[in-house]
Amino acid sequence: MPQTFTLKQRIALAIVPRIASAVICCLGVTLRYEDVTDPDTLPGYDTPPPAIYAFWHRCLLASAWRFRNHGITILISRSFDGELVARTVERLGFVAIRGSSSRDGAAGLRNLQRAYLAGNYCAITA
């Protein structure tokens, strides 16, 4: 069932993702990364698909910039906040799949599994 949003929410959905993605881009160009891996292991972004990434919530801003435009499929909550996040990361080149523990979680995981089996990169947050 499609979500319905109040006028205030629709305005926020039209504005916030644009501003948030612009802020991520502005901050992202100032970030420097150091890949720390075992010498025999490829860094995560060099791993051929399908692969699963797990990100800590506290690292989402840096991860959104680092892994932008890779077509990574992300499981995102069906809440209003999740809608803001989904629209923001889609502007950065991610694919959003919706589902959470309280709203369509099983369907979200099944869709994430389908994306993985189709050969896509997938991501979850911890």
Regions flagged by a language model, labelled:
Residues 49-52, 111-126:
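Conserved Motif II region of HX4D acyltransferases
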Residues 1-70, 86, 113:
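Membrane-anchoring hydrophobic helices of lipid-metabolizing enzymes
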Residues 23-25, 95-98, 123-126:
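Short, basic, glycine/proline-bearing loop/turn elements
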Residues 13, 81-82, 123-126:
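Short secondary-structure transition/capping segments
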Residues 18, 84, 107-111, 117-119:
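Residues forming well-ordered secondary-structure scaffolds
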Residues 50-109:
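Catalytic core of membrane glycerolipid acyltransferases/transacylases, capturing the structured
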